[in-house]
A protein has these predicted regions:
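N-terminal accessory targeting/assembly segments
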Residues: 1-161
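Residue-level signature of catalytic and energy-coupling elements of molecular machines
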Residues: 102, 175, 362, 407
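Flexible glycine-/small-residue-rich
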Residues: 104-106, 113, 155, 177-179, ...
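P-loop NTP-binding catalytic core
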Residues: 116-126, 133, 137-247
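Switch/coupling sub-region of P-loop NTPases
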Residues: 238, 248-254, 263, 267-404, ...
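Conserved glycine(s) of the Walker
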Residues: 260
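Short, well-ordered beta-strand core segments
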Residues: 410-412
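NTP-binding/hydrolysis catalytic cores, primarily Walker-type P-loop NTPases
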Residues: 418-482
Length: 482
């Protein structure tokens, strides 16, 4: 203890227990909320007024904390501004220089950094969606509504720094709300920092000579010891399909109605996700009704989906609100920084959007399509993509080239009257197009043989980046007569 002007004070300590610091934070938050409630009786507070109020409360509480021998960290200022503005921890995350994207998926926050990819950052505060919709509306842009549940907005956010200065950040908000996101709001914020004079002075090609981005985090694929039985896949075929997805390939699952396309796709996707830390792979799922459920999620909008986004279409109803199409949802997906997009059933313009997405780096993607054979996948795809205005203006050879660049492999499933459910064929899609036929080239890797099951054809995968050695699977699994 020591005395200043007759006042007894404890020595200020920077190191305090987490419980004590949390208690002081609660005092700060309670007093901030109380003062805001009083001020709000007169008028609605602007973001600048909330910042001033938060700094004032921080100074007042800090003086009392010093009397008790505690020094409150200045980071509490930004945390308090977030608390009072309804932004919660979002403001602190936007302020961080290493974060490029922030995702609010139902009740949970994920952040994307160049070094670590997607990571879970904790629960989202209640009312965060309301706060963001107000921000969008005040900026004179269209906020999402149940009639128009998808919105894309570009805002400027003034982020207060602890030293009293303010940093301008650009935030692009992609917002999907019910009914398009049936379990709750799905929001992605892409954060960009405006360059300061200091940045421009020190930002030159010298940085590129000294630094580089780290490798994309990807686990080494080790073939799984799947049991051999009377199922539709052999261990060899299962490991090939799984390795393709783990390495960021795009898979087409084709078949007739009721053949089990969706179920097979779901099992392959889940096995792929299990190779990564939970939440590290972000998938955007688009369906007419939600059938694909991953990561053991129970459908509760307050529980963590593991960074999986579930969206559904809304059909056109005469006299009702505008439809929400798969095309709309995929375009929204591409603003959400997903690793992959999954379509329950491609039958229109959305098929072309997915191909374009897969060709530009959104691997780990998959879609199902109705077809009567593996060879029929191409003409069926060519038929459905004509609904897209861009594809309708392109030649068949151009569409074939895009398909070949994007799709890694295709699986054909049928429910046979004699044999039941079978995988009739698994083909690799070559990057080389058959120009005379104006179609992609399919190389059969596994074919169903009556009495034997799904057997290797002897062809080896030759697609660059997806050869046996690239996939870390033995070439022997493709040997005919295995």
């Amino acid at each position: 203890m020591f005395d200043i002007a007759g006042k007894t004070m404890k020595p200020v300590s920077e190191v305090r227990s987490s419980d004590e610091m949390e208690r002081w934070w609660n005092v700060l938050a309670e007093e901030g909320r109380a003062k805001k409630a009083i001020e709000s009786l007169q008028k609605s507070l602007t973001s600048t007024e909330i910042e001033v109020l938060a700094r004032q409360v921080f100074e007042e509480v800090s003086l009392r904390a010093v009397d008790a021998g505690v020094s409150l960290p200045k980071e509490y200022i930004l945390r308090l501004i977030g608390e009072l503005s309804g932004m919660g921890p979002l403001l602190e995350l936007i302020a961080r220089s290493d974060i490029e994207d922030i995702a609010i998926n139902l009740g949970h926050i994920y952040v994307y950094t160049t070094s670590n990819g997607w990571e879970h950052a904790g629960p989202a505060p209640d009312g965060i969606g309301d706060a963001l919709r107000v921000m969008i509306d005040r900026a004179g842009q269209r906020a999402p509504t149940p009639d128009y549940p998808i919105a894309d907005a570009m805002l400027q956010v003034m982020v207060p720094l602890v030293d009293g200065t303010v940093r301008r950040k650009g935030v692009r908000i992609n917002y999907v709300m019910p009914p398009a996101s049936p379990y709750g709001d799905t929001i992605t914020l892409r954060v960009s920092s405006y360059r300061t004079a200091s940045d421009l002075t020190h930002g030159s090609l010298a940085l590129l000579c000294q630094n580089r981005l780290p490798p994309v985090p990807r686990p080494k694929f080790d073939p799984k010891d799947f049991p051999r039985g009377n199922g539709i896949l052999t261990p060899e075929a299962a490991n090939y399909l799984l390795s393709v997805m783990v390495h960021g390939g795009t898979l087409v699952i084709a078949g007739t109605t009721g053949s089990g396309k969706t179920f097979v796709g779901q099992r392959i996707l889940q096995e792929m996700l299990d190779y990564y830390p939970r939440g590290a792979i972000r998938l955007f799922i688009v369906e007419d009704s939600n059938e694909i459920i991953l990561n053991g999620w129970n459908g509760d909008g307050k529980t963590d989906t593991g960074n999986i986004i579930y969206t559904v279409t809304r059909p056109e109803i005469r006299g009702g609100p505008p439809p929400v199409t798969m095309y709309d949802l995929i375009r929204s997906a591409l603003r959400s920084r997903p690793h992959g997009v999954v379509i329950g059933e491609a039958r229109g313009a959305e098929a072309w959007e997915l191909i374009r997405a897969a060709a530009t780096g959104h691997g780990h993607s998959a879609f199902t399509i109705h077809a009567t054979s593996a060879e029929h996948v191409w003409p069926r795809f060519l038929q459905v993509v004509q609904a897209h205005p861009d594809a309708a203006r392109m030649s068949e050879i151009q569409i074939a080239q895009s398909f070949a660049e994007a799709v890694t492999a295709a699986v054909y499933i049928e429910r046979n009257p004699q044999h039941g459910q079978i995988v009739r064929e698994i083909v690799e899609v070559s990057t080389i197009v058959e120009r005379s036929a104006a179609r992609p080239s399919f190389s059969p890797l596994f074919k169903y043989e009556a009495g034997k099951g799904l057997m290797p054809t002897g062809n080896r995968p030759m697609r660059p980046g997806f050869r046996a050695n690239d996939l870390n699977i033995p070439e022997s699994i493709f040997k005919a007569g295995l």
